[in-house]
Amino acid sequence: MKKYQIMYYVGAAISLLVGLWHFTVPWMFGWASYIPYETLVVPINYVNLCFSFLLSGLSLTVILWGKKVFVQNPEVLYLYGFLLALWIFRVVVEVIYPCPPESNVWMSYGQFGGSVLVCVLLLVPFIRVASTRKNRKK
């Protein structure tokens, strides 16, 4: 069970770091210069800030309640499942609508690879906990 806990905490920690890093992305990459209408800059920044706050908060909550996941607390499993669903959604969206690699190849493939990594790190422990929970009920 220890390796699943390590995967869980590493995946949640990377998710938290992505959320915190995302606060700075619009300014690091000069998003405003790519947006043709000045009136859209502030709303896009608001959406990014809200997403960053929610991803960071959800990831931190999942980290802080990690022990409850492995004793199979149902409420915590729902939060964990939601975080996992978010990363699965991210991977699926990237497959359907890939980031154009001509803008920055390493960034495009790095984002996709990182998303798959976090998804796997969170998915494997989730399957393990869910399967032991079902076996426990029988």
Which residues are covered by each model-predicted region?
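Cytosolic juxtamembrane helix and N-cap/initiation of the first transmembrane helix
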Residues: 1-17
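Membrane-interface helix-loop junction between the first two transmembrane segments
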Residues: 24-36
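Membrane-helix boundary connector in multi-pass membrane proteins
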Residues: 70, 85, 91-109, 127-128
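Membrane-interfacial loop-to-transmembrane alpha-helix junctions, especially the N-terminal start
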Residues: 8, 73-82
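Membrane-water interface at the C-terminal end of transmembrane alpha helices
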Residues: 116-136
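Non-cytosolic membrane-interface motifs at loop->transmembrane helix junctions
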Residues: 34-45, 74-75, 101-113
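Core segments of alpha-helical transmembrane spans in multipass integral membrane proteins
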Residues: 17-19, 26, 40-67, 81-89
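Membrane-interface helix-boundary motifs at transmembrane edges
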Residues: 1-4, 67-74, 101-104
